[in-house]
Curated annotation (Swiss-Prot):
Protein EC: 2.7.4.6
Subunit field text: Homotetramer.
GO biological process, alphabetically ordered: CTP biosynthetic process; GTP biosynthetic process; UTP biosynthetic process
Any Pfam family: NDK
Signal peptide residue numbers: none
Gene giving rise to this polypeptide: ndk
Gene3D superfamilies linked to this entry: Nucleoside diphosphate kinase-like domain (3.30.70.141)
Stated name of the protein: Nucleoside diphosphate kinase
Catalytic reaction list: a 2'-deoxyribonucleoside 5'-diphosphate + ATP = a 2'-deoxyribonucleoside 5'-triphosphate + ADP; a ribonucleoside 5'-diphosphate + ATP = a ribonucleoside 5'-triphosphate + ADP
Co-factor requirement: Mg(2+)
Location (main, coarse): cytoplasm
Organism this protein belongs to: Laribacter hongkongensis (strain HLHK9)
GO MF terms, alphabetically ordered: ATP binding; metal ion binding; nucleoside diphosphate kinase activity
Taxonomic lineage from the root: Bacteria, Pseudomonadati, Pseudomonadota, Betaproteobacteria, Neisseriales
Record NCBIfam families: PRK00668.1
Family per record: Belongs to the NDK family.
Length: 141
């Protein structure tokens, strides 16, 4: 099995609900290690840059507004098949369609306020990790 890294963000809605620890427990209980983490309040520029791939999509402005509405918790997860494992733990983007027991089914309110972000591929994980963390901020365990 391949040890991978993926980027995860606990979004403003979940931070406001004080469920960061519960979400971290899901990661760690399922074999993912947190190898870097920081809480930050994204600037508009940071949010627009991070989600630039969606710039032409109709939801882009609402997504940016939501992501700058409060602090987020950004972390790098490491483990076997980390990208896929994290996506399975998160559940479907729309919490109404997410399987019971997934992070979004348990903690998200809507397709917009959906508690967490996770990289969708190894390639994007590398780009997203580098967006928020320097190599010296990631601590292999």
């Amino acid at each position: 099995m391949a040890i991978e890294r993926t980027l995860s963000i606990v979004k403003p809605d979940a931070v406001a609900k004080n469920v960061i620890g519960k979400i971290y427990d899901r990661f760690e209980s399922n074999g993912l290690k947190i190898v870097a983490a920081k809480m930050k309040h994204l600037s508009r520029r940071e949010a627009e840059g991070f989600y630039a791939v969606h710039k032409e999509r109709p939801f882009f402005n609402d997504l940016v507004e939501f992501m700058i509405s409060g602090p987020v918790m950004v972390q790098v997860l490491e483990g076997e098949n980390a990208v896929l494992k994290n996506r399975e733990l998160m559940g479907a983007t729309d919490p109404k369609k997410a399987d019971a027991g997934t992070i979004r089914a348990d903690f998200a309110e809507s397709i917009d306020a959906n508690a967490v972000h996770g990289s969708d591929s190894l390639e994007n994980a590398a780009i997203e990790i580098a967006y928020f963390f320097s190599a010296t901020e990631v601590c292999p365990r």
